From Swiss-Prot:
InterPro entries: P48_Baculovir (IPR006962). The gene is P48. The keyword Transmembrane helix does not apply. One of its GO terms (cellular component) is host cell nucleus. The lineage of its organism: Viruses, Viruses incertae sedis, Naldaviricetes, Lefavirales, Baculoviridae. The keyword Lyase does not apply. This is p48 protein. Plays an essential role in the production of budded virions (BVs) as well as in the envelopment of occluded derived virions (ODVs). It is found in: Host nucleus; Host cytoplasm. Keywords: Host cytoplasm, Host nucleus, Late protein. It comes from Autographa californica nuclear polyhedrosis virus.
Length: 387
């Protein structure tokens, strides 16, 4: 089959100076059709992008299989935990990918609690032949839509996102194109590994900066949840504030670790029952942990009185204790301290470097002695979003 040259642009900046850099990827027509279909699902524009005969899981799985194959063919990829592709492989596990079809259901249901995020301007893309049907149908328009989707996704990953599942779904699509981009005419700093590093570092920074809640959550819509959680958390010990996620997760699995654990779980249980009714999901318990981590946990934490930490840090502590379940209090405190310092380092590099080099990852892991944490994440033999 004939390969097409797709031109797209990504945004880079130093302080307030922004620069759009044009890239060129070589893609087959089937790949372009597949990526357009997946991006139309990502941006909730599937009704105006023609994609007959394609199914979400099949196309997304093709994307993941291709990325994993590319990563596995890289020399020393499996031997070096400092390799950004090895770290990124955490998000490419089969257990995690099986959850992705549910992610779309979750994103669609929770969208009403978030401010809208930018999407490609379809009207500006459509040619005169496609406009009568109000649908992107011709190959040329699909190429334009794909290029616009990549630029919009890139800006969205930099500016922050509404639901934490969004980058989980979007980053593999970007990765797929980066792995098919020609870097021969680019400067040494602009290469595959550095661009992947740039995306990962920006993603991680936004995650620990609490951008989703602070910038995109419609807090007035969530007030009823906080009120319900306030009733349920009465009597919860302060030392358990950073274990709420672990307590609720255990309670979901029928293991009570605190007094009145069933009462503590009730607000979230009611929310999931209502979500099940509205989404027609037969086994809503399959997505319970994902919804709890990504959305409802925050309302429990907002409702707590006499908090020892800011809510954003309390949320981070809950997630760290949940994932690093065998860590002692001392180890958790040390990890949180490291993350605070890492956030400063990342902020500095994002502001002063147009492109963050892969060596930055190695520098951070070595500087803060993160080999143990990275190894634990890479070697997890279960899906931490579905314990």
């Amino acid at each position: 089959m004939c390969a097409y040259r797709l031109q797209y642009s990504l945004r880079f900046n130093i302080y307030d100076r922004f620069e759009n850099v044009c890239f060129e990827a070589q893609l087959l027509q089937d790949e372009i059709d597949s990526l357009c279909f997946l991006f139309s699902k990502y941006f909730n524009q599937s009704l105006i992008v023609d994609s007959k005969g394609l199914t979400f899981f099949t196309e997304f799985n093709k994307c993941i299989v291709s990325i994993k194959s590319s990563f596995e063919n890289q020399a020393n990829n499996t031997d070096n935990i400092h390799n950004v592709k090895n770290i990124f492989s955490i998000f490419l596990r089969d257990e995690f990918i099986k959850q992705v079809p549910h992610f779309r259901t979750i994103m669609q249901y929770l969208q009403k609690y978030y401010n809208p995020t930018p999407a490609p301007d379809v009207d500006a893309i459509m040619c005169q032949s496609c406009k009568p049907a109000n649908k992107i149908q011709c190959f040329e328009c699909k190429c334009k839509y794909l290029a616009s989707s990549l630029s919009t996704l890139d800006a969205g990953l930099q500016n922050g996102w509404d639901i934490f599942l969004r980058p989980m779904f979007g980053m593999p699509l970007m990765l797929y194109v980066l792995l098919r981009t020609d870097y021969k005419n680019e400067s040494d700093i602009i290469n595959e590994n550095n661009l992947i590093t740039q995306i990962f570092v920006q993603f991680f920074y936004n995650l620990i900066c609490d951008k989703a809640y602070s910038l995109y959550t419609k807090r007035d819509m969530c007030v009823p949840f906080v009120k319900e959680c306030k009733k349920a958390t009465v009597g919860l010990r302060q030392e358990d504030h950073e274990r709420v996620l672990s307590i609720l997760s255990a309670q979901c699995n029928g293991c009570s670790t605190v007094a009145n654990g069933d009462r503590l779980l009730l607000p979230f249980k009611n929310f999931m029952i209502e979500m099940g009714r509205n989404t027609k999901m037969k086994k809503v318990n399959k997505i319970a942990s994902t919804v709890l981590i990504g959305f409802y946990l925050r309302h429990y934490l907002e409702s707590l009185p006499n908090k020892a930490y800011p809510v954003a840090e309390l949320e981070l502590r809950n997630v760290c204790r949940f994932i690093m379940s065998k860590y002692s209090d001392e180890n958790i405190n040390l990890l949180i301290h490291k993350l605070k310092l890492i956030k400063i380092d990342i902020c500095n590099v994002l502001m002063t470097e147009m492109i963050v080099p892969e060596t930055f990852i190695r520098h951070i892991i070595t500087k803060y002695q993160l080999d143990n944490e990275i190894s634990l994440l890479i070697e997890l033999n279960h899906d931490c979003f579905n314990k």
